[in-house]
Amino acid sequence: MADRETVIGLECHVELNTQTKMFCGCRNGFGAEPNTNVCPVCLGHPGSLPVPNREAIASIIKIGLALDCEIAPHSLFHRKNYFYPDMPKNYQISQYDLPVCIGGHLDVDLPDGSTKRVGITRVHMEEDTGKTTHGSASGRIHEAEFALVDYNRAGVPLVECVSEPDIRSPEEAATYLRELRATLESLEVSDVRMEEGSLRCDANISLREPDMSELGTKVEIKNMNSVRSLERALNFEIERQTKALENGERIVQETRHWDEDAGATSSLRSKEEAFDYRYFPEPDIPPIEPSPKWIEEIRASLPELPRARRERYQRDHGLKPEVARVLVADRASTVLYERTVELGAPHQAAANWIT
């Protein structure tokens, strides 16, 4: 029997590095004492009114343009209703059917030398939630004896980049995530530190029989805080689903939690549908209607993107593809290389020294 086809889509959440939160004047920063960067707006006190952060809106437009998305002339914020301890308002200000950015793609260079185009369904804006820390000897959620909630992160501007289900292997997923991370870092809209949570990635994965056009039952995986974790979690889930199907079991649509220490996923909850959140338009925030002039000003400010920079290093500097890839993988290496060359170092010598 032919192998089943793996179908993967990624939802990447990006914390923006604005000075203040999305809808209030509280400081946006990592590492402060718990519950110190809070106010009536981000804590959801009655009577407090949100005011959109213009810098954050400019950042999502910049991301959308870099991903070749269409910037919507009219988009709305919605209330996404659900109950959770780290949601002080019991709803999250997000976007539903009218996001800022629609369509688009990201081209990624695969290890075999081929190029994969991954479609971008949408890029939308929302506020982040607070952070819950579960206390247990093992550090596992299901064994927690208590939970602590820090609302410093509540209200931080968050951009969600949703890919099409175009990814066919864990290796492709890892390559896509690296390329997206490099793109976001080059735009200077986020520090994209997965270990600090400023870039978080959820994966939707299903298996389908060969020559089938319909997708299989989708499972969402959460809690992957590195590219390596993403690959490991997807490989485990492929093996788990394959064994289940071979044993005649039915795959359940659910959200699963990745346990890095155990190297396995475990069931967290049933997978929600959009209607479970009872979306409705946010009455306190007007529509986002960026002018064409503002969009073009942002487009003109875009830097050289990672893929174009790699091609230039190979074409004009004579660097090998693998060397160019290392130099462009993070902004610090890129800046160091560019500055070293500006000071007179030969291209190859500078690249060898840095890599």
Can you say where each PLM-predicted feature lies in the sequence?
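Short acidic alpha-helix initiation/capping motifs at coil-to-helix transition points
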Residues: 301-308, 314-318, 328-333
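Histone-fold and other basic nucleic-acid-binding segments
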Residues: 318-355
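Basic, nucleic-acid-interacting segments
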Residues: 1-304, 315, 321, 342-346
